[in-house]
Every structure is written in C-alpha cells, then in structure tokens.
Amino acid sequence: SGSIHRNVLDELAPRFIVQGVSEAELAVNLYAEMLRRGSHGVARFNLPLGEDVVGLASFGKSGLVKTAFDGPGGTGGTCVAVQSIGSAFRKLQAGRLVYLDIPCGVDGYHTDKTVVYYYGDLDQDPFSDKIRSAYEHCVFLEELTASLLQPGMVIENIYRQVMEQFDPQYENGFMNGGKFLGHSIG
C-alpha cells in the first residue's frame, strides 16, 4: 500500500496536475491509478462509519474549507452537502496550491498520504517567500514528530512537544483547525 502511494502521489501525480483539470477529475484519476496498481479501493480508519474511497483534491483556498472529516485539509467539494472528492467545476489555474489527500489499501492494510504541490512558477508568485516559509516549517514539524516516534512514547506527549515548536502565524489553517498531527489510518 505504501509503495503504491509513493508511486502514485510522488511520481505520477505531477503528470496529472495540468491547467484546467478539475479537483474531482484529478482525485478520480489518481484513485484509478492506485486501483491499477493493486489498491483494494477502500480505506478504513478508527471512526464510526470510518471508510473513505477516493479521498480529495483541492486547489487554492478550497483546501482550507473545513469538513466533518478530521483531515489536515478540506475541500469545498461540489456543494456544502458533498464535501469530498473535490469540485467538478473548480479548475486548476497557475499560482495555486494543489492539496491531495487520497487513501490507499492493499489486502486490508491501509496507508494515508497527503501531499501538496504548487502549480506554476513559484518564483513569480508574489507570496513565494510565505509559501516557502510555511513549507519549511511543515517539514521541520514533520521531522521533529518522526524523531519523537519511539517505542513507549505517549502520543499526547509527542503532540505537546511538537506544538511547543509550532509557529502561531499558521494556526488558522493548520490541520484544518484540528488538534492532531495525524489520524488513524495505517
């Protein structure tokens, strides 16, 4: 499952991130690539009725829309009643962040992977410094979290230690407002 995730979201996704693709089309295309490589097509996690199929793709501010799901980002979806997959009408334009949160599973083992791409020439973006700074802070937090994941560690203590290093300028959109660093897939 992890190998499929790496292949599809790290290696193939950039080929599908093209001008004019819709959020929904991108999510479904990547989901289909996972199925072609052996994903069983459903991911389960530790919530009541906790199943996900396609996951979601979001462009720009759509990724900051809060949903009922406890993921690190969100989507406006097609409408407020369908906040999943992504919008079939929101098309990718240059200068947008592309947020992908698409689960994968093989033989009952589930992995979860979220990636963010920038579509366009980041050097030409007037917010390039802010985007790079936010990226560097996220990498710092991820590396710190990974370094603390040791046998016997209490997850709540890891969360507290990481959040002590958190830059409050990002709190408005961090983990879509949730108080977690990950959730129960994998």
Residue ranges and their predicted role:
Residues 1-186:
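Active-site neighborhoods and metal-handling regions in enzymes and metal-associated proteins
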